[in-house]
From Swiss-Prot:
SUPFAM superfamilies: Urease, beta-subunit (SSF51278). GO terms for molecular function: urease activity. It catalyses: urea + 2 H2O + H(+) = hydrogencarbonate + 2 NH4(+). This is Urease subunit beta. Belongs to the urease beta subunit family. The gene is ureB. It is found in: Cytoplasm. It is an enzyme of class 3 (hydrolase).
Amino acid sequence: MIPGELFPETGDIELNAGRATVKVAVANTGDRPVQVGSHFHFYEVNPALAFDRAQVKGMRLDIPAGTAVRFEPGDQREVTLVPLVGQRQVFGFNGKIQGAL
């Protein structure tokens, strides 16, 4: 083995296989771009993003880890979300939960 050597599997990797998803229409009502990372608790994103927040409590974007979605001012698009898993406790972000979902 060579340091840093990779042994990739063949074929495609399906993200969040078997997990329930929700599609939500999101609009940036602000005058600045808003970027949301892959593991950010979507319920707590920038208030300039308009959508049904109650529907997305405990969810994050269904995109590869380390990536993000950018909403330009006036943009409206549909995003796919998946539930947070594990202990389903949320701390930090914008401080709206600070505990169990």
